[in-house]
From Swiss-Prot:
<keyword id="KW-0276">Fatty acid metabolism</keyword>
<dbReference type="InterPro" id="IPR003231">
    <property type="entry name" value="ACP"/>
</dbReference>
<dbReference type="GO" id="GO:0000036">
    <property type="term" value="F:acyl carrier activity"/>
</dbReference>
<feature type="modified residue" description="O-(pantetheine 4'-phosphoryl)serine">
    <location>
        <position position="40"/>
    </location>
</feature>
<dbReference type="InterPro" id="IPR009081">
    <property type="entry name" value="PP-bd_ACP"/>
</dbReference>
<comment type="pathway">
    <text>Lipid metabolism; fatty acid biosynthesis.</text>
</comment>
<dbReference type="GO" id="GO:0016020">
    <property type="term" value="C:membrane"/>
</dbReference>
<dbReference type="Pfam" id="PF00550">
    <property type="entry name" value="PP-binding"/>
</dbReference>
<dbReference type="GO" id="GO:0009507">
    <property type="term" value="C:chloroplast"/>
</dbReference>
<feature type="domain" description="Carrier">
    <location>
        <begin position="5"/>
        <end position="80"/>
    </location>
</feature>
<keyword id="KW-0597">Phosphoprotein</keyword>
<dbReference type="GO" id="GO:0009245">
    <property type="term" value="P:lipid A biosynthetic process"/>
</dbReference>
<keyword id="KW-0443">Lipid metabolism</keyword>
<keyword id="KW-0275">Fatty acid biosynthesis</keyword>
<keyword id="KW-0150">Chloroplast</keyword>
<dbReference type="GO" id="GO:0000035">
    <property type="term" value="F:acyl binding"/>
</dbReference>
<keyword id="KW-0596">Phosphopantetheine</keyword>
Length: 86
């Protein structure tokens, strides 16, 4: 089972890579748009990269609710747990 810390590190890495910024800039409460300068296309690409990395599906409605690293991590944990319990 993947730990929360491992998920956090992977999400930070994805955000860093997608936005072309250093991992040190990607904090747990970093807002993708307000703090890290992501635009709407960046947000779509972040969601797609997260889906691919964790083998999950994120609906458009859910994607709109994910605006920072913490929310992404919590969503991924919920998805993984729901998959395991299905």
């Amino acid at each position: 089972m993947v730990t929360k810390e491992e998920i956090l590190k992977k999400v930070q890495s994805i955000v860093s890579e997608q936005l072309g910024i250093s991992k040190e800039q990607v904090l747990v409460d970093s807002h993708f748009t307000n703090d890290l300068g992501a635009d709407s296309l960046d947000n779509v690409e972040l969601v797609m990269a997260i889906e691919e990395e964790f083998n999950i599906v994120i609906s458009d409605i859910d994607a709109e609710k994910i605006s920072n690293v913490r929310e992404a991590v919590e969503f991924i944990i919920d998805k993984i747990n729901n998959k395991a319990n299905a």
